[in-house]
Amino acid sequence: MTTLFISDLHLDPSRPEIIATFRRFIADEAVNADALYILGDLFEAWIGDDAYDATGKQFIDAMRPLRDAGKPCFYMHGNRDFLLGERFAREAGMTLLPDPSIINLYGTPTLLMHGDTLCTDDEAYQAFRTQVRAAEWQRQFLSQGIEKRQAFATQARNQSQRHTRDSSNAAIMDVNQQAVETAMKSAKVRRLIHGHTHRPATHSFDLNNAPATRIVLGDWYEQESIKRIP
């Protein structure tokens, strides 16, 4: 029994090697797993289900072996692809999963998150996130033409890349430990799995006088990054 967790593929036409790696992963490994969880930032940008490009089509095609095998795939929104909707998820064979979600993973309650809400020290990002996750903002954005939406996405991505390259922001772009502990206490769990930070690791710490674990998923820029449980 194995369940697979991935995140932060950032699929984009400029990185065809990542979709090729993902295609092999689905055909060679995911079809034999109990389930696949994708915890956000599957795509570099997503401006609506009515506007996906060749990469979106390639992803749907890459997922075909998983659909044919009848294996479940669960998808959680990231900060880059939070507008991915039911229509595309259905075509790809994915079930949308709220952020956060608690699952029973082989007898262990496990909290799943994308991870961006844990980066509470990055106040500028959290303010932006609150704005773009509002239902009214999304309604207005999706009502705009594709070119206008694409221009906004490009601008937001460029700004995010500048923010990431600024070394003075390195600390605030990681999770806040207090936010981690608050989320885990609220969920009544001792294991958390998330992505977003691109800092793959397994962190062990004390939570209410008992051991707890935070598993961080990596990105796929250089190679595939997969967490296999158990």
Regions found by a protein language model. Give the residues of each.
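Tryptophan-centered motif/residue detector
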Residues: 46, 137, 217-220
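Core catalytic region of metal-dependent phosphoesterases/phosphodiesterases
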Residues: 2, 11-105
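Residue-level marker for buried hydrophobic side chains located in beta-strands
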Residues: 3-5, 36-38, 111, 193
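N-terminal short leaders/motifs
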Residues: 42-66, 162-175, 179-192
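Conserved beta-sheet core of the metallophosphoesterase superfamily
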Residues: 91-98, 109-111, 116, 121-128, ...
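Active-site-proximal loop/helix segment associated with metal-binding centers of metalloenzymes
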Residues: 115-175
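Short, low-complexity, intrinsically disordered N-terminal peptides in bacterial proteins
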Residues: 1-2, 230
